[in-house]
C-alpha cells in the first residue's frame, strides 16, 4: 500500500493527496465542467465533501494505487495524477493523469509524470511503470516520450470512448532505464530561398488531398488509391506519431510569397545509430516544374547534415518517373542502383546524398 502522506515536489508542482481543505477548489472545478479529476470524482458539488473524505482515497485503501492532486506554487489544483493497477507481487504499476484545460500546454503533465515515476523507483520496490494513451491523443503521446517512456506497441481498439473504440499505445518505463527522452527530430521550421518548411498540420489537409488524389501522384507513389480528405487527415496524424516514436518528421513546403501549399516532404526510416534516413515528397500539381521539390529536399538535407549531424540521406524514385529522378540529381544525389519490385512491384531508382555531396 502507498503511504497516506505521499508528497512529491517538482520544480513547479507539489503532488499530494486530496483533502478536505481542497473543497472550495474542487467545487469550482466541478462547477466549471472541467473533466480532469480522477475516476469517480463527483459531477455535482453536493458530492464533493464525501468524495474528498473517502471516495478519492478508496484506491489507496485497496492497495492498488493512489490519487494525487497537482498543485502549483499558489496552491491551485492544476491537474491530477495517480498510480493504479499496482501489482506488488509483479512489481508493476500504471500512471495516469489529467490537466485542467486552463493549464494545458505548459509542461505540467510531463513534469508530474517524471516526478512521480522517480518517486516510485526511489521509495518502492516496483520495477516497471506503464503509461497508456489513445493513438490519436498526440498530446499524451508527447508527454510519454518527453517523460522518458518507451513506445512498446499498439493495442487495437482497446480503448472505448463515447465516439467508439480507439487504438491504445502502451508505453513502459523500467527502473533500469535511462531517464532521458528517446531521440526524436524536432518539429523545426526551415526556410529556403522561396519556401517556408513548417511542420505538417491540419491546415495542410486541403493541399494534401488535392496532391494525393492527382493522377500522377497516384501513379508514381504509394499513396492510397482514391485519396480522400480522410486519408490526408490520417497522414498528418501518422506523421506526428512517427515523429514521437523517433521514426521521422514531415513538413509542408509553402511559398514564402503567399503561403500556397507546394509540397509535402518527410523524413522516414531514421537509423539513429548509423545516422541515416530516407526522404520522400509529393509535389502539388500546380507547383511541378518550378523546382520547389528539389529546393525543399536540399534545404532539409542541409539541416539534417549540418544541424542534426546525420551522415546519409536516401531518396527512391520510380523508374517510370523521370521528373522525380531529376529532382534527386539536381539536388546532388548520387544514383546507386535499382531496387527491383520495391513499390507495388514497380522498380525504384535508389539515390543517396552524404554531407560531402552538398552543393
Which stretches of residues belong to each language-model region?
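Short loop/turn motifs at secondary-structure junctions and domain boundaries
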Residues: 58-63, 149, 241-246
Amino acid at each position: 500500500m502507498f503511504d497516506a502522506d505521499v508528497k512529491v515536489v517538482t520544480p513547479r508542482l507539489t503532488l499530494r493527496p486530496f483533502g478536505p481543505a481542497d473543497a472550495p477548489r474542487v467545487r469550482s472545478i466541478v462547477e466549471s465542467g472541467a473533466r480532469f479529476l480522477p475516476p469517480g470524482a463527483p459531477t455535482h458539488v453536493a458530492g464533493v465533501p464525501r468524495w474528498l473524505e473517502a471516495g478519492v482515497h478508496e484506491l489507496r485503501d485497496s492497495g492498488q494505487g493512489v490519487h494525487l492532486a497537482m498543485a502549483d506554487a499558489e496552491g491551485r489544483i492544476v491537474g491530477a495524477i495517480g498510480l493504479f493497477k499496482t501489482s506488488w507481487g509483479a512489481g508493476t504499476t500504471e500512471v495516469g493523469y489529467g490537466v485542467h484545460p486552463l493549464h494545458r500546454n505548459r509542461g505540467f503533465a510531463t513534469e508530474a509524470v517524471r516526478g512521480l515515476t522517480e518517486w516510485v523507483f526511489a521509495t518502492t520496490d516496483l520495477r516497471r511503470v506503464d503509461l497508456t494513451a489513445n493513438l490519436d491523443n498526440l498530446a499524451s503521446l508527447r508527454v510519454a516520450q518527453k517523460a522518458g517512456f518507451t513506445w512498446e506497441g499498439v493495442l487495437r481498439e482497446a480503448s472505448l470512448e463515447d465516439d467508439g473504440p480507439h487504438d491504445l499505445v502502451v508505453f513502459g518505463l523500467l527502473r533500469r532505464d535511462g531517464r532521458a527522452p528517446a531521440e526524436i527530430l524536432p518539429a523545426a521550421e526551415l526556410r529556403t530561398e522561396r519556401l517556408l518548411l513548417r511542420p505538417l498540420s491540419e491546415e495542410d489537409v486541403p493541399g494534401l488531398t488535392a496532391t494525393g488524389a492527382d493522377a500522377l501522384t497516384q501513379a508514381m507513389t504509394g499513396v492510397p488509391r482514391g485519396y480522400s480528405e480522410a486519408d490526408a487527415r490520417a497522414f498528418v496524424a501518422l506523421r506526428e506519431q512517427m515523429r514521437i516514436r523517433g521514426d521521422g518528421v514531415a513538413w509542408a513546403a509553402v511559398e514564402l510569397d503567399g503561403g500556397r501549399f507546394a509540397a509535402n516532404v518527410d523524413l522516414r526510416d531514421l537509423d539513429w545509430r548509423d545516422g541515416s534516413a530516407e526522404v520522400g515528397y509529393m509535389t502539388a500539381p500546380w507547383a511541378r516544374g518550378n523546382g520547389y521539390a528539389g529546393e525543399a529536399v536540399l534545404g532539409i538535407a542541409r539541416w539534417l547534415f549540418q544541424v542534426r549531424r546525420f551522415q546519409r540521406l536516401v531518396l527512391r524514385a520510380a523508374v517510370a518517373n523521370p521528373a522525380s529522378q531529376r529532382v534527386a540529381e539536381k539536388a546532388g544525389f548520387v544514383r546507386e542502383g535499382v531496387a527491383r519490385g520495391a513499390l507495388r512491384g514497380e522498380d525504384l531508382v535508389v539515390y543517396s546524398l552524404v554531407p560531402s555531396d552538398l552543393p
